Curated annotation (Swiss-Prot):
Protein name as annotated: NADH-ubiquinone oxidoreductase chain 4L
First-tier enzyme category under EC: translocase
Record membrane topology: Multi-pass membrane protein
Gene that this polypeptide is encoded by: MT-ND4L
Originating organism: Ziphius cavirostris
Disulfide bonds: none
Pfam families the record matches: Oxidored_q2
GO-annotated molecular function: NADH dehydrogenase (ubiquinone) activity
């Protein structure tokens, strides 16, 4: 395994640890998930470039499109929650309350 692959895997792991540890604010959770998606994009692009598998060359672009959609929906939810509750604390968002 090359050094570039190891760096991408470390970036994914750090984003996952950040998501698990710092989940008090919605904005930090969204940033950690965006870091995970970008590291998956780089890993998929590197894997396809190293294996010369041209049929799967659209997969990183599709993954990037889904990451952009996820970011847009997450930011829309963040704006809605900030306007409704005044904060972006995740623990205040209990969906089971009426």
């Amino acid at each position: 395994m090359s050094l570039v692959h190891m760096n991408v895997i470390v970036a994914f792991t750090l984003s996952l640890v950040g998501l698990l540890m710092y989940r008090s604010h919605l904005m930090s959770a969204l940033l950690c998930m965006e870091g995970m998606m970008l590291s998956l994009f780089v890993l998929a692009a590197l894997t396809i470039l190293n294996s010369h598998f041209t049929l799967a060359s659209m997969m990183p672009i599709i993954l990037l499109v889904f990451a952009a959609c996820e970011a847009a929906i997450g930011l829309a939810l963040l704006v809605t929650i900030s306007n409704t509750y005044g904060t972006d604390y995740v623990q205040n968002l209990n969906l089971l309350q009426c």
